[in-house]
């Protein structure tokens, strides 16, 4: 049997021993089932290892195990299979996080760039997948390329670390070791986009991974070649809540809210076009369903029109009234009444988001049904507000609310040392119309 079998078999035994620590250790005999008793005796393994095969336990210290490995490597250093054997053993050590054994292998010629024959991952990729941060640091200190991508998926170690919440320690270590936080794969996908795309809001919550990447300088404007942005995943997950399990929908909404908070805190713009990639636009279209998130967006300063092209591209006012006019219902319909109430609050939030109201051109509506008069009155109040110079009272309300941004503005309003009547006026949900006095 060649050195490849020698080193591989010995490494398996050493790996298991290292995992159990010093003292009485049970070997994983299943890992030696491919070796016959005769073949095992032919390996240059000390008698203690062969006895362990039969007795399933042995006593050895970590130092003695390192010594065994070192002696074997020195004895077989001139074998034609040496390089392949030690490099293959390094992959196994990386998987199990056995840093001392890996260090011995590296000092004795193991190739940092050796790839697993099945996955084509290097030892660094494997260490990340198994969440072995100390192994990650050891490999990088020995010269492993911290940004190296695998040949199949073009995933970097940072990409892999970002995809699972359990790999947060490796993610942090990679950033500390200088990994490029904004490096992109062949599809233009950065580690931040990997973290977002891997989250389902129910079983996988990469919130802390996303936070760490953003704090490490991840670009919130990153876009893939297919046009996916940091909000693409959130928009998709919000769509999954429609008609789904209520408990799962609640979990998804909570995750989307938390991630949106993080993204906006680091400068992400949820109101950019195209409309189908705009989180603000999506929330406006379904403002009743996504009311808490929409409120957060508007109270955090998100534009209610397209932030790139203004109301000529898309307008929040137009979207809200389009939704109101298309909703079937009657005056006694609780769902329609709730829709109207939330529409009033959303419109009020948009009005207090800027000192000068910006209504879209050709802003005409044609409501039908028993609530048509109320919808028409709401529309008329906005037209009036746009037609006349804003009152001092309105300007003060807008300025104070803008000053109290970001969310939650109403909580901050209630904490102000003001009379209750003034607080009532500053709150977004106080009025039945957008503005009672023009």
Residue ranges and their predicted role:
Residues 2-110:
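N-terminal segments that cap or nucleate solenoid repeat domains
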Residues 2-43, 283-296, 300-438:
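Cullin-RING E3 adaptor/co-adaptor recruitment helices
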Residues 59-61, 92-97, 126-132, 160-167, ...:
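Ankyrin repeat A-helix N-terminal signature
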Residues 68, 100-101, 134-135, 166-170, ...:
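Conserved ankyrin/ankyrin-like repeat signature
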Residues 71-77, 103-111, 137-145, 172-180, ...:
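Ankyrin repeat domain, specifically the short helix-to-loop turn at the C-terminus of the second helix
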């Amino acid at each position: 049997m060649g050195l490849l079998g020698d080193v591989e078999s010995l490494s398996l035994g050493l790996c298991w021993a290292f995992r159990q620590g010093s003292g009485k250790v049970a070997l994983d005999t299943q890992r030696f089932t491919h070796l016959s008793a005769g073949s095992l005796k032919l390996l240059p393994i000390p008698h203690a290892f062969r006895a362990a095969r039969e007795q399933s336990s042995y006593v050895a210290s970590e130092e003695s195990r390192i010594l065994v490995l070192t002696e074997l490597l020195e004895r077989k250093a001139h074998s034609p299979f040496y390089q392949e054997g030690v490099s293959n053993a390094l992959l196994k050590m990386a998987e199990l996080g056995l840093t001392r054994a890996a260090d011995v292998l590296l000092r004795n010629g193991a190739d940092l760039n050796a790839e697993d024959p099945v996955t084509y991952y290097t030892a660094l990729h494997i260490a990340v997948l198994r969440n072995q941060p100390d192994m990650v640091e050891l490999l990088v200190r020995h010269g492993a390329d911290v940004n190296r991508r695998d040949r199949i998926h073009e995933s970097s170690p940072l990409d892999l670390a970002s995809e699972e919440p359990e790999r947060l320690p490796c993610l942090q270590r990679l950033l500390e070791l200088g990994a490029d936080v904004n490096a992109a794969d062949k599809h233009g996908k950065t580690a931040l986009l990997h973290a977002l795309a891997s989250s389902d809001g129910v079983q996988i919550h990469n919130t802390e991974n996303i936070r760490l990447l953003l704090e490490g300088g991840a670009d919130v404007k990153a876009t893939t070649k297919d046009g996916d942005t940091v909000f693409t995943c959130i928009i998709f997950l919000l769509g999954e809540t429609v008609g789904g399990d209520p408990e799962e929908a609640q979990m998804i909404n909570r995750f989307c809210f938390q991630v949106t908070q993080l993204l906006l805190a680091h400068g992400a713009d949820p109101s950019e076009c195209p409309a189908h990639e705009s989180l603000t636009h999506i929330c406006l279209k379904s403002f009743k369903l996504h009311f808490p998130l929409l409120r957060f967006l508007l109270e955090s300063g998100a534009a209610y029109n397209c932030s790139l092209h203004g109301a000529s591209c898309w307008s929040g006012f137009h979207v809200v009234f389009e939704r109101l006019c298309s909703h079937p219902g009657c005056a006694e319909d609780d769902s329609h009444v709730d829709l109207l109430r939330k529409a009033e609050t959303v419109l009020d939030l948009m009005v207090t988001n800027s000192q000068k109201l910006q209504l879209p051109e050709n802003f005409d509506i044609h409501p039908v049904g028993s609530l048509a008069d109320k919808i028409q009155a709401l529309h008329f109040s906005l037209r009036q507000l746009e037609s006349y110079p804003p009152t001092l009272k309105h300007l003060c309300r807008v300025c104070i609310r803008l000053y109290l941004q970001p969310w939650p503005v109403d909580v901050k309003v209630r904490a102000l040392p003001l009379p209750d009547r003034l607080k009532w006026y500053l709150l977004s949900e106080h009025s039945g119309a957008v503005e009672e006095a023009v």
